[in-house]
Amino acid sequence: MADETKKEQIGSVILDLSRYSGEDLYCDGEVEDRILEIAKNYPEEEFDAIIRDSKDWPTLYHLSSIRGNIVGWIPFDGSEKVLEIGAGPGAITGVLTERCGSVDCVDLSRKRSLINAYRHRNCSNLTIHVGNFEDIEPELDRDYDYVFLIGVLEYAGSYLHSSDPFGQELRTILSHVKPGGRVVIAIENRIGLKYWAGCAEDHSGRYFGGIESYSAKEEPAKTFTRPALERLLLENGVREYAFYYPYPDYKFTSVLFSDRRLPEAGELNENIRNFDRDRLLLFDEKKAYQGITQDGLYPLFANSFEVVVGPALPVDYCKFSNDRAPEYRIRTEMDLVGGKVRKYPQTKAAGEHVLRMAESAMALSARYAVSSTGEGHPKLPEMGGKPSEKSGETEETVAAAKPRTLNIAPCTLTKDGGVEFPYVGGRSLESLLDESLQAGDGERFLSLLNEYRIRVGQGSLQQISDYDMTFSNLLIQGDLWTAIDCEWAVPRSIPVEELLFRSLLVYYLEDGKRSERCEELIGNERLLKAVGIPEKDAQRLAREEQDFQKHVTGGVVSLGEFRAQMGTQVIKPAQLQTEEEKNAAKELLKQEHEEKQELNSIQVYYDTGRGFSEEESYWVGEQYQEEGLVTFTVTVPEEAQRLRVDPAICPCVVLIRNARINEAEQKAVRRLVRVNGRHYTNGSIVYTTMDPSMEWDLKKLRRKAGIPEGEDFDLELTLQMAGLPSTMAQAMEDRR
């Protein structure tokens, strides 16, 4: 029985400390203090901006709403009683409290539990138990609908005293699930493809740590291959389970695949996601996935697993549109058994956007129904391509395929605030185009574009168009073409040439190799002619696409862009680099050196009574040398009233090593300097600004040096400077 005197209440959340030892044995240190302050003082709606400004791994990992995707696809009905083991700062908890009836959390750390409590303080259905799971477990209920172990099972050996910690964990958890309930486990794959390609093992930070079967004596966690995880389930009495594959991994899921809906190679292009540390690049994962998916090996090499123990769920695939403005964030689910595709808003603001799809589908269906009768469709000019000999097409077979219509997948509203489409089989136009490029069949590629132009262009006099009629949104079965997404329909007629050009542009942007292959096989000039877009219009349409993407994203930085901003490196060994890559690396080093030289340049300003200005300034020719030392001389004109020296164009630490006026050492130079940084007792000046400066009142300096007014003089300075990383400078500024 829990001690009622050892409970705290934060808002509506109960914090049960009756089994807390009084010490947090697991902590990220000072960063958790900062995250706790964020949870106390900022609403979740502001977390994205805080993450963007912080540019550090712990803030991203603990506060990103994308973390919740790993459970966000589960079809809760709102009545569920759930248990979350290892809840930490609550990255997953928010989704559970919002969509379930009651939530019990367990975590070892009081500080992390406080973060969880403060960020969800308005949730009256949340109780957090703080302490070791072994101590808390006997008092937990045994009728949960769901128990979640998200990134937890691999640590069982560190918090369970057992010769079989993983089996013991599973058996214990199963005893707390009611009949018909489920256990959900998310965990890394010990031999996930990213580890072969050069990512360090997630927990130990060692390269190939998991691949080498955790040969090191001290490993903080141990993950499993798919066969080993299945064996663990079977050995502990589990017979009903399903494997899902979060991509790129379970931490930041953008797509969820399953054994009933495995990925195609073209869907696996988010592979550079090393937020927390540098990685090697030993091969191109996307290319490796081509053979892996074709040979049915993806379940063995997926980076993560999500296992649902218990009755099957009616979801076989889920895609999250994360990198968007809140009003456009949605998820798309497939139920292959039920033959349904559903779309749901991920935010309250996106509700209207989703509901609008049903109306758009009706309008588009009406357009193409009219076009199938031949009405409202002007004759299109011929394309630049001919029927493909390699594909076996002839003028006669193409003509025999008419009428060449476009089917619009019907869309209906659901009772739970989403929309529903019938599942449509077939192959995407995108995959058929890829197949043509891989086969070296440029004529077939052009023939498919021609077919797009004919079918999508029908009914063009109607005032409705689907702006996002991209190749991936068109599914083909024999002669039946079906558009499966009407999310971005607009109430106006868009020329089919512009829709085709945009689709081709999106196709290229998703994989740069496609444009290179098209140039080799077809040539850009012929391709643009075939699409029907002049060069000047192509430039305009490319700008319009950029504007559209800015509108959709609303300034949200994608995870790929954010990783680049964080500064973690992707290192390709020299032996694996092509000559082109080596030359590019040399050019980059040269550019970085020039930029560094520019940042370390010294600028001198004089104030002759009109204030400091660029007109009365110059760049010092001398550069910082070994140990960051430089000596230079400033000739101060007689009319100058003030002097300013900018030692760099970046945050830095500066020390005035020596100062001489007219060849005589002058200590007054150090005493009289005014800076926009901070003086330290050792004489150094720390600047956290990008525009550091040192300034002297020349009237005072002349008087101290015994130089008459109206006389010029030489000031020789020896400075020592070390640049500061912007993140370090910001941290120092925050502590002032």
Predicted features along the sequence, with ranges:
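Short alpha-helix
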Residues: E218-F243
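ATP-binding glycine-rich loop module of kinase domains
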Residues: K319-A361
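A short glycine-rich, Lys/Arg-flanked "PGG" loop and its adjoining helix->strand segment in the class I
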Residues: D164-R182
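Catalytic activation segment of kinase domains across protein kinase-like and atypical kinase folds
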Residues: Y214, Q463-E516
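Conserved class I S-adenosyl-L-methionine
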Residues: V184-Y207
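Conserved SAM-binding loop of SAM-dependent methyltransferases across substrates and taxa
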Residues: P89-C100
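N-terminal auxiliary segments of SAM/dcSAM-dependent transferases
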Residues: M1-Y42
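Conserved structural core of kinase catalytic domains
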Residues: N407-L449
